[in-house]
């Protein structure tokens, strides 16, 4: 493929003169940017950050930007950023329609993760890019294909004598078995064109290999079988190259875990800590050699396996696109990788680009770090039934944190607290018992606690832990430094016995005030709290210093606002004279708290700046836009703990602190901050507590005459039994102060009640547990609103497609609501008014309400903070709810007048938000939906009606393939209700073949299907044989599964569980909730004929749902 870049001569000239004109790609006025879609395991918020930076870079050059991304929660889909936004599936099919309509001059493929890259390759192979003369900016398609196709990649690296693990590309199971014999077991299997190691794994023998190869080939057309190098060190380099060959390495990183754990699931440190100078330069030179040979133009990530005790190495893989690692590298160094890569894509060379952080140097430099960065992944595996907790070559984490310190211990302990606020820092856990050696040997999401247990409590030596875990001794000796401080603290008998020297040394190694207090209390008969430790250290003058990340290790003057705190310093790098407004970000992405709260935080900062306020953001998530260098006046990459927030609040002498836009984490420390003198903006934290505490909340609802399901506060199992028998099962048990329904459960009988009560009490022992009547079959409604001094300014009413009982974060939301009368809307607004008044709300709040029957409305929850649906309602209605909330915080003349967007405005469009699940990644997990949240992200689409918007939205979820007739559909689940029959009766009329696994279901379906030509076939279901199941799905061409079981499986032997799980494993659409199953069946009936006609046509026919956001809305909002 010929280059679209005009010059090929290398140059090192810096931009100096006014009249110098860079040689840019010619004829590019409009650029199509491909987003990554809904957040999933392996592809998360890092692409919101990189895509947002890319759009900013393009707009600086006056390019018209067209974005396709159905992830409505992201910052990049804010309407102040791209010129045009399409909330449509990121698939070759839909991108072709957009190209047909928009005729862009160029396309950016490397900012949308694996999804975007795969789309680009498919569009090139099908000839679409050539047909419409769309230029690919940045790395050429040929290079992308070479880096993704394992055979081509191996051959390219052989050309330049770069060693890679011996490997064979295979397209069948037999080929894979033969390859494994040739490279000798153990082997690793990798999928080509797959994300986050999806479809990869280790095999120790032929039977394991057969199973793994079959599964991997169902996810990708080609797999690579290679010798396993488990136990070697894993090291990564981020490299940038421009069109004329200038190359720099921006960051190198070292994994704490040896090879065998996917880098996304490994703790990572930057810069590398255990490499010799020779090893460092050997790998750096190889990275530059690789990127030049492959012809990368932009940013690239190179992953190595390095022999622990020698100079032997292998290249594991090259990502010729922006990745999770590049987001981390960008935040770790302060070097704006995505921005620079986008500029390089336009044709700029590195010496022509100013460094936007320092403002005084050019981008053609390698950052130098005078600090250490620690990244730790966040797993949420405990939310899933039957999930396999081991971690390996396929990624399972849902988010990550980044901590900065002046030494390993400081960064490591900070990061551990960030990833789980219930941890004190580096600590042990008694959960392993006599399985401790096994816990050290096998990587799981809990292994770091096993290391803590071994070193702190079980007196294991570094040698023994190293032998079992293969983790480098350097890291373990550093952990021992923390252990030694623990030992010293254990001998302290009282607060007055704690010396300044010990306190200072503990703080320098990353100990928190609370950690110090708890450690002393455990071994002395004291009851010291963290506030007393804080008071003592302040009296002794032990206060953290604020340091600046300047990318240049303080060698050049820098103007960065990118800050962290440390006890390993002697002076501050900044002056504290701005009294900025503090905004607390969302912290780590996890199930229940994701990119939507980052959108809220970013929009809060933007509105504050628009109002002339100085802004200070605290957040520690490297995947976010809120931690980008140009979003706020000052950014602290720091913990969201009481201790750290108060440190920064006091140092900065902040005007106030906003705690209600970052989800549950900031909310949890609000009361403590307020009680200790922090000016909390908006609703009084005492009032927030009255909503978070279930008992207080329910009592106030009773007092203001707002209906709710019957409830009772639990003090004993006996009382609970009495209440349940009074209101009749099912009942809902819920603890206070939780996010995403953690430990919430629906209980159907007395036996379940006893088991669940223990669990609920364990979740938040400091707060009461409340039990309420669970109303089956009711409709659920979300109300998002903003109030000022108890008066509602603006509100949105979204209805759930699913019945109550599915967590609101896993529900499909429809806005404007399609099935609510004006009377119901008026009643909902009345409830919102009463609640806002009773809690004296100023700022955002969200309520979940159930509609039981025609007119009965009952409130089930109220959160006095922004909810995860705030970006959705803001973008669908064209009114920025966060902007209004911030104006309410500030008060005065800028507070807008109240407006009713639900009754006084008519809409000729509908938007539907649907959840994005990541069950494919979570081996064994039951994809059954309930009151505890399971989705990792969301997507939304617009349409003229509910059918059109849901049809587009469901196709926007990752790897969703619409089943085309006459393929087969497998039915299973509960036959005591009508739903399954209603779904079957619809799909039978469209020409699908209908299958089931037992006589009862067959008879039931036959009774419901009225179509004369349709027949129900019974198939033998080999439930315990994965290979035969796969063959069965292929033989009967099963392309969708409707399994409407009414409750979770009680064992992994349950046929419904096996049906659900295998639909996920074989990448087949699964519908297991009655209302969404019915809605999808109606979509198929309405849309499938049109889809088939479009797919069979030789011309490009654009379906009616392909319209941009502003075409639906009718105006360009905020």
Swiss-Prot record:
Cite the binding residues for Mn(2+) 2: 317, 319
- Record-listed Mn(2+) 3 binding positions: 848, 861
Q: Which residues form the ATP-grasp domain?
A: 154-346, 698-890
Q: Which Gene3D superfamilies match?
A: 3.40.50.20, ATP-grasp fold, A domain (3.30.1490.20), ATP-grasp fold, B domain (3.30.470.20), Carbamoyl-phosphate synthetase, large subunit oligomerisation domain (1.10.1030.10), Methylglyoxal synthase-like domain (3.40.50.1380)
MF GO annotations: ATP binding; carbamoyl-phosphate synthase (ammonia) activity; carbamoyl-phosphate synthase (glutamine-hydrolyzing) activity; metal ion binding
Q: Quote the EC number.
A: 6.3.4.16, 6.3.5.5
Carboxyphosphate synthetic domain: region residues: 23-420
Provide the residue span(s) of the region labelled Oligomerization domain: 421-573
Q: Which stretches does the entry tag as region Allosteric domain?
A: 959-1102
Indicate the impact reported for residue 316 to G/S/H: Reduces ammonia-dependent ATPase activity 17-64 fold
Q: Enumerate the residues binding ATP 2.
A: 734, 773, 775, 780, 805-808, 848, 861
| Assembly description | Heterodimer composed of 2 chains; the small (or glutamine) chain promotes the hydrolysis of glutamine to ammonia, which is used by the large (or ammonia) chain to synthesize carbamoyl phosphate.
Q: What else is known?
A: In S.cerevisiae, this enzyme is synthesized by two pathway-specific (arginine and pyrimidine) genes under separate control. One is linked to the arginine pathway and is designated CPSase A (CPA1-CPA2); it is repressed by arginine. A second one, CPSase P, is part of a multifunctional protein (URA3) encoding 3 enzymatic activities of the pyrimidine pathway (GATase, CPSase, and ATCase); it is feedback inhibited and repressed by pyrimidines. Present with 18000 molecules/cell in log phase SD medium.
**Can you name this protein?**
Carbamoyl phosphate synthase arginine-specific large chain
Gene that encodes it? CPA2
């Amino acid at each position: 493929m010929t280059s679209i870049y005009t010059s090929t001569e290398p140059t090192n000239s810096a931009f100096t003169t006014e009249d110098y004109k860079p040689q840019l790609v010619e004829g590019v006025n409009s650029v199509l940017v491909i987003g990554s879609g809904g957040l999933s395991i392996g592809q998360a918020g890092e692409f919101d950050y990189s895509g947002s930076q890319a759009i900013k870079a393009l707009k600086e050059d006056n390019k018209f930007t067209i974005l396709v991304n159905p992830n409505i929660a992201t910052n990049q889909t804010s309407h102040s950023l791209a010129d045009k936004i399409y909330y449509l599936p990121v698939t070759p099919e839909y991108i072709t329609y957009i190209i047909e309509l928009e005729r862009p001059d160029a396309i950016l493929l490397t900012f949308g993760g694996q999804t975007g890259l795969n789309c680009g390759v498919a569009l090139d192979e099908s000839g679409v890019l050539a047909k419409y003369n769309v230029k690919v900016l940045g790395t050429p398609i040929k290079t992308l294909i070479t880096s993704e196709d394992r055979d081509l990649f191996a051959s390219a690296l052989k050309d330049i004598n770069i060693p890679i693990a011996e490997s064979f590309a295979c397209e069948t199971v037999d080929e894979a078995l033969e390859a494994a014999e040739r490279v000798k077991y153990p082997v690793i299997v990798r999928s080509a064109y797959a994300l986050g190691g999806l479809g990869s794994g280790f095999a120790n023998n032929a039977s394991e290999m057969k199973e793994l190869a079959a599964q991997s080939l169902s996810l990708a057309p080609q797999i690579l079988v290679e010798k396993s190098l488990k136990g070697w060190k894993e090291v990564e380099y981020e490299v940038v190259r421009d069109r004329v060959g200038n190359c720099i390495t921006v960051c190198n990183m070292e994994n704490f875990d040896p090879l065998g754990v996917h880098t996304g699931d490994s703790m990572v440190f930057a810069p590398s800590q255990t490499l010799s100078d020779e090893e460092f330069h050997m790998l750096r030179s190889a990275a530059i050699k690789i990127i030049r040979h492959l012809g990368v133009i932009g940013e690239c990530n190179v992953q190595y396996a390095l022999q622990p005790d020698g100079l032997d190495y292998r290249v594991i893989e090259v990502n010729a696109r922006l990745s999770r690692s590049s987001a981390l590298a960008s935040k770790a160094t302060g070097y704006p990788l995505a921005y620079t890569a986008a500029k390089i894509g336009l044709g700029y060379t590195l010496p022509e680009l100013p460094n936007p952080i320092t403002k005084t140097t050019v981008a053609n430099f390698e950052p130098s770090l005078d600090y250490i960065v620690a990244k730790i992944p966040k797993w949420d595996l405990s939310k899933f039934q039957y999930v396999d907790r081991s971690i390996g070559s396929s990624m399972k984490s849902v988010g990550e944190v980044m901590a900065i310190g002046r030494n390993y211990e400081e960064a490591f302990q900070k990061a551990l607290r960030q990833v789980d606020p219930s941890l004190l820092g580096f600590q042990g856990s008694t959960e392993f018992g006599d399985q401790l050696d096994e816990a050290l040997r096998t990587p799981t999401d809990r292994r770091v606690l096993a290391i803590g247990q071994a070193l702190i409590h079980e007196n294991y030596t570094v040698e023994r832990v190293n032998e079992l875990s293969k983790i480098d001794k350097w890291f373990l000796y550093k952990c021992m430094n923390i252990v030694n401080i623990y030992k010293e603290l254990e001998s302290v008998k009282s607060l007055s016995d704690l010396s300044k020297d010990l306190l200072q040394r503990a703080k320098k190694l990353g100990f928190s005030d609370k950690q110090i207090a708890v450690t002393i209390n455990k071994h002395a008969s004291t009851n010291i709290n963290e506030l007393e430790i804080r008071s003592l250290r302040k009296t002794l003058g032990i206060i953290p210093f604020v340091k600046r990340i300047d990318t240049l290790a303080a060698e050049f003057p820098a103007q960065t606002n990118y800050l962290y705190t440390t006890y390993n310093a002697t002076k501050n790098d900044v002056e504290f004279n701005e009294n900025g407004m503090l905004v607390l970000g969302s912290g780590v992405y996890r199930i229940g708290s994701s990119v939507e709260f980052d959108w809220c935080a970013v929009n809060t900062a933007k509105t504050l700046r628009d109002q002339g306020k100085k802004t200070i953001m605290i957040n520690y998530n490297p995947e976010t836009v809120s931690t980008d260098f140009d979003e706020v006046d000052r950014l602290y990459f720091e913990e969201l703990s009481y201790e750290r927030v108060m440190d920064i609040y006091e140092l900065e002498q902040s005007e106030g602190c906003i705690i209600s836009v970052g989800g549950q984490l900031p909310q949890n420390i609000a009361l403590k901050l307020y009680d200790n003198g922090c000016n909390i903006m908006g609703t009084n934290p005492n009032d927030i507590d009255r909503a978070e505490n279930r008992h207080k909340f329910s009592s106030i609802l009773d007092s203001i005459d707002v209906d709710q399901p019957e409830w009772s506060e639990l003090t004993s199992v006996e009382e609970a039994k009495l209440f349940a028998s009074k209101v009749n099962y099912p009942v809902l048990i819920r603890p206070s102060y939780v996010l995403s329904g953690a430990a919430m459960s629906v209980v159907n009988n007395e036996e379940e009640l006893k088991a669940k009560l223990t669990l609920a009490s364990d979740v938040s022992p400091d707060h009461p547990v409340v039990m309420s009547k669970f109303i089956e079959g009711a409709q659920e409604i979300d109300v998002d609103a903003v109030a000022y001094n108890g008066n509602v300014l603006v509100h949105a009413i979204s209805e759930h497609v699913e019945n109550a009982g599915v967590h609101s974060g896993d529900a499909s939301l429809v806005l404007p609501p399609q099935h609510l009368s004006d009377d119901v809307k008026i009643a909902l607004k009345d409830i919102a008014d009463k609640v806002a008044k009773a809690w004296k709300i100023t700022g955002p709040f969200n309520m979940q309400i159930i509609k039981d029957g025609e007119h009965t409305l009952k409130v089930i929850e109220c959160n006095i903070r922004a909810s995860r649906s705030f970006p959705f309602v803001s973008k669908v209605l064209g009114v920025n709810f966060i902007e209004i909330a911030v104006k309410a915080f500030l008060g005065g003349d800028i507070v807008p007048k109240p407006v009713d967007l639900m009754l006084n405005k008519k809409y000729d469009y509908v938007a539907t938000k649907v959840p994005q699940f990541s069950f494919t990644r979570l081996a064994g997990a039951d994809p059954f939906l309930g009151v505890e949240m399971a989705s990792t992200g969301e997507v939304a689409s617009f349409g003229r009606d509910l059918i059109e918007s849901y049809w587009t939205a469901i196709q926007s979820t990752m790897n969703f393939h619409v089943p085309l007739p006459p393929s087969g559909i497998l039915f299973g689940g509960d036959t005591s209700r009508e739903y399954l029959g209603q779904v079957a009766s619809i799909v039978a009329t469209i020409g699908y073949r209908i299958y089931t696994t037992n006589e009862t279901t067959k008879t039931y379906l036959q009774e419901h299907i009225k179509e004369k030509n349709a027949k129900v076939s019974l198939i033998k279901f080999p439930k315990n044989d994965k290979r035969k199941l796969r063959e069965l799905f292929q033989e009967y061409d099963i392309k969708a599964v409707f399994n409407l079981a009414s409750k979770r499986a009680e064992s992994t032997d349950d046929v419904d569980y096996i049906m659900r799980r295998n639909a996920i494993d074989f990448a087949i659409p699964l519908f297991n909730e009655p209302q969404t199953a019915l809605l999808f069946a109606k979509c198929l009936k309405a849309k499938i004929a049109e889809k088939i006609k479009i797919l069979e046509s030789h011309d490009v026919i654009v379906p009616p749902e392909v319209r941009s956001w502003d075409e639906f809305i009718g105006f360009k909002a905020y």
